[in-house]
Amino acid sequence: MVADNEPLIVDNTQEQRYELWVGEVRAGVIEYDTEPGVVVLIHTEIDPPFEGRGLATKLIAGAMEDIRARSLKVVPICPVVRAYLRRHPEDRDLVVRPSAAQ
């Protein structure tokens, strides 16, 4: 069970976004697109009343955990996700590397 103040991360596949919930309030999202074996992380947003609490980091970490559990890879388009990956080398193995042919 999750306490009311403990953030909960949910993959809303219908809307193609990871959602971060604080109690009954959706506090943030990561919008994504999918390709075979890959999740393209497009945009991260934390609602203004929840900014400055480290929730973007928790949301991205939760998304990375889910992506890893599903044996998928990541294309980080979102600058917030890219900044997270610079600070969290433990998740860099999930990033799809461009091929030499590109």
Where are the regions that the model predicts?
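A short, internal acetyl-CoA/4′-phosphopantetheine-binding micro-motif in the GNAT/acyltransferase core
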Residues: T44-E51
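Conserved beta-strand in the GNAT
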Residues: V25-D33, V40
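Conserved acetyl-CoA-binding loop-helix of GNAT-fold acetyltransferases
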Residues: G52-M64
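C-terminal structural segments of small proteins and small subunits
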Residues: E65-A101
